[in-house]
A protein has these predicted regions:
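Exposed, low-structure sequence patches enriched in small/polar residues
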Residues: 1-178
Length: 178
């Protein structure tokens, strides 16, 4: 019917092991049990507009075969919203907004609790098949910033409202035919 025509759903699951290379001082890299899940949907309200929403969850456990095997090294949550709009056959706009939250066990992972929000905008103009002009902009905000009282150290904040990266770029892609 109409709902299935405009919506599609997807998901995946992976259970296995992965190596933690980002260990704190005195802890060797180790293999831990990992669970990775994703779920999402695509909404196409019209032929020109497409909205994708995806949620990713990843958990890495402590070193396998040790007393810490049941511990959690980290849990990572990532939510991604992607919107594509096709103005004409040649001109399109894509935006992506990511929100990333990393909760780390400092005894097993050399990383602080991280909250990060990223936004990307990309205009694409297809001059002809094989040739495209791109104009893009991206922003990154984090909950980590330089501590004004101790400039060589990072300070943790609650929400990702400190800008840590910004880019504006233009790219021309041309296909050479021989």
């Amino acid at each position: 019917g109409t709902i299935t025509k405009h919506f599609t759903f997807n998901g995946s699951a992976f259970v296995g092991s992965a190596v933690n290379y980002v260990t704190p001082a005195g802890v060797d890299p180790f293999a831990g049990a990992t669970n990775t899940y994703s779920a999402g949907f695509t909404w196409r309200p019209s032929g020109r507009l497409r909205v994708d929403q995806t949620y990713f969850y990843t958990r890495l456990g402590g070193p396998q075969g040790t007393a810490l095997a049941g511990a959690t090294a980290y849990i990572n949550h990532l939510s991604r919203t992607k919107v594509n709009y096709q103005f004409t056959k040649a001109l399109s706009l894509r935006t992506i907004v990511d929100y990333n939250f990393l909760s780390a066990n400092l005894a097993l992972l050399s990383a602080d609790r991280l909250k990060q929000a990223t936004g990307d905008i990309l205009f694409t103009y297809l001059l002809n098949p094989g040739t495209a002009l791109y104009l893009g902009y991206n922003n990154r905000y984090e909950n980590l910033a330089l501590d004004p009282e101790a400039p060589a150290q990072l300070k943790r904040y609650g929400v990702p409202d400190y800008m840590t990266g910004r880019q504006l770029y233009i790219k021309l892609s041309y296909l050479f035919r021989f």
